[in-house]
């Protein structure tokens, strides 16, 4: 009986020794990979780190993980103005991509549901965006002025294709969606924010 137990123990040890890398080992590998990149290459090419940096602004985004044919991470809503308003202005975040290794699209959305505090919300939204981009040494060079004026705009920001879309939600209130695209991104679907208000395919 003892020899059988000993044999079983050896089998278990062998099985444990043959297991794949641990979570900590994967995180260390991701961090090492991220350290070799900079700018947008790092923002799109290091999903785990990017989600962590987004979460510094309170979005509490989920892990970047498989969701049907794509990979998604979703965060928010976060309150961007008077929290005790009947319907505070809020922001949400999504990252989408075709593979686990890279993000193809970063989407930040501001829903203006409290007109009385809309200017404050837009200002804070811009601060969040600039704070996020500053971690990668990226400057919008005034491009986010379209947010405060509630004007749709398209053009590169730091070399990456970007768009600011101002649409109306089901209740007629403004929704400002800022999208940053990886130049070679191939995500086959748009994140949910655009679909929710019926303004995207």
Placement of each model-derived feature along the sequence:
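Short, surface-exposed beta-strand/loop "edge" segments at domain boundaries and coil↔beta transitions
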Residues: 79-81, 86-90, 114-119, 182-193
């Amino acid at each position: 009986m003892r020899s059988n137990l000993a044999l079983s123990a050896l089998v278990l040890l062998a099985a444990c020794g043959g297991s794949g890398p641990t979570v900590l080992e994967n995180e260390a590998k991701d961090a090492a990979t991220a350290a070799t990149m900079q700018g947008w290459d790092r923002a799109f090419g290091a999903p785990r780190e990017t989600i962590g940096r987004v979460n510094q602004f309170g979005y509490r985004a989920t892990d970047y993980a498989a969701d049907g044919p794509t990979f998604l991470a979703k965060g928010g809503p976060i309150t961007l103005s008077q929290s005790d308003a009947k319907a505070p202005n809020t922001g949400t975040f999504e990252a989408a991509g075709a593979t686990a290794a890279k993000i193809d699209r970063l989407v930040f959305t501001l829903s203006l549901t409290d007109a009385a505090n809309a200017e404050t919300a837009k200002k804070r939204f811009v601060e969040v965006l600039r704070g996020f981009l500053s971690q990668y040494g990226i400057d919008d060079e005034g491009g986010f002025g379209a947010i405060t004026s509630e004007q749709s705009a398209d053009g590169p920001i730091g070399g990456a294709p970007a768009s600011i879309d101002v649409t109306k939600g089901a209740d007629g209130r403004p929704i400002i969606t800022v999208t940053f695209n990886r130049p070679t991104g191939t995500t086959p679907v748009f994140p949910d924010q655009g679909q929710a208000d019926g303004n995207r395919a």
